[in-house]
Each structure stands twice: as C-alpha cells, then as structure tokens.
C-alpha cells in the first residue's frame, strides 16, 4: 500500500495520515525527517545534503529522490509507505517515476481556500502547554483564554491570514499541477486516484478512506 497524499496546507492530511499509518501499519515518509536521519547517520547522501545546506543552498531533487529510494528499502516499508509533502512539483513526480518508485494510490483532499483560511486563521494556541483551540470548532470557555490556566491564547505566525494565503498561493502554483499529473497517470492505469471532500467530519473521511483502500 504505497500512498501519496495531496492537498493544501490545512486540508487535514496530517490527521488522516495518522489514521492510515495505524490502519495499514505503514510509515509516513517525510523528506525533512529523512534528511535529518541521513545527516545524523553520515550516509553518502546525508553528507552531500549537509554540504549543500551548510552552503545555504536548496537540496536538489536528485538528492531527495535518492533519499526516498534509500528509505523505502528499509524493513518498515515492506507493506508500503505514505508520502505527505512529496512530491511537490512535476519534476519531482517525474523523477520518482523514472527511478521506479511506484505508487498505488494518490489521495487528494479537496478544500476551498476560504475554508482553509477560516480553519487556520481561527486557531488559538496556549504557548505554555501547546493546547490548541479554534474560535468556531473548539472554542475556549472564555474567549482568548486557556481553559486550564486562564492565560492569554495567541495566534501563531503561521496561522495569520496573510501567511496562510501566501502558502496557498505557493501550493496552487507548484503542487496543484500534480492533481492533473496523477489523474493522467490513473487514466493510463499506473495508479489509482481518489478525490475526497476534505470539509467532511474527520471520522467520515477516515471511513471513506478505509472503504476506498480496502
């Protein structure tokens, strides 16, 4: 069960990734985690990546693909894996294909921009404990105060409307073309493509995923 999750930041991919990992016993492969592990282990690719990062440059797709190929040969990927946040661009998707990284299912979480802005913009955090509230979906008992301590809640910089819209802009420009790419791959019989309404309740989406993937 090799799965790619697609969807804008705040579309609920992280929540469902956890469900899929638990249900199918597969690891989530994050490029950030892979990079850190390879650098720590001092693998040839890790050393190469460290050199690039130390020079303040961006890691090339070649290095990332190399890390993905290395990672999916490990024992915990025997039953499959889950990719979230990669590939982000068409060249990365092409490189994966050229390197023989096969994917069984691509799942898109479809959520309108305005819903994401409301979802993320409504988050409030208690800095001391990390407790997260939402002004609409999970409001504190007293507005802008933590339930346990009564201390002020804050809006994280990542959740301001301006930042959220900027991230959505990057997503539409870079990652949205992957929707067409993988739909074409599915039409050619190379993978299965599933588009889910990401505004449904978490449990409803999990149930749908379970039915789709079997």
Swiss-Prot record:
Pfam family, one: ADK_lid
Membership in a protein family: Belongs to the adenylate kinase family.
GO molecular function: adenylate kinase activity; ATP binding
Gene3D superfamilies: P-loop containing nucleotide triphosphate hydrolases
Name of this protein: Adenylate kinase
Organism of origin: Pseudoalteromonas translucida (strain TAC 125)
EC number: 2.7.4.3
Function field: Catalyzes the reversible transfer of the terminal phosphate group between ATP and AMP. Plays an important role in cellular energy homeostasis and in adenine nucleotide metabolism.
Metabolic or biological pathway, per its Swiss-Prot or TrEMBL entry: Purine metabolism; AMP biosynthesis via salvage pathway; AMP from ADP: step 1/1
Keyword ATP-binding recorded: yes
Keywords linked to the UniProt accession: ATP-binding, Cytoplasm, Kinase, Nucleotide biosynthesis, Nucleotide-binding, Transferase
GO-annotated biological processes: AMP salvage
Subunit architecture: Monomer.
């Amino acid at each position: 069960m090799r799965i790619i999750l697609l969807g804008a930041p705040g579309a609920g991919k992280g929540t469902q990734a956890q469900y899929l990992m638990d249900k199918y016993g597969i690891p989530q492969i994050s490029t950030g985690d892979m990079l850190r592990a390879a650098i720590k282990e001092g693998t040839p690719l890790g050393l190469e990546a460290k050199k690039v990062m130390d020079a303040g440059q961006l890691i090339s797709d070649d290095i990332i693909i190399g890390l993905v190929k290395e990672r999916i040969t490990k024992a915990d990927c025997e039953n499959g894996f889950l990719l979230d946040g990669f590939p982000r661009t068409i060249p990365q998707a092409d490189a994966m294909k050229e390197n023989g990284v096969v994917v069984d299912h691509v799942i898109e979480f479809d959520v309108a921009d305005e819903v994401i802005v409301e979802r993320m913009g409504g988050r409030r955090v208690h800095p001391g404990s990390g407790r997260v509230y939402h002004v609409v979906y999970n409001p504190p008992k007293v507005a802008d105060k933590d339930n346990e301590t009564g201390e002020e809640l804050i809006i994280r910089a990542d959740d301001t409307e301006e930042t959220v819209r900027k991230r959505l802009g990057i997503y539409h420009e870079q990652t949205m073309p992957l929707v067409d790419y993988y739909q074409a791959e599915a039409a050619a019989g190379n993978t299965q493509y599933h588009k889910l309404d990401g505004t449904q309740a978490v449990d409803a989406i999990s149930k749908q995923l379970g039915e789709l993937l079997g």
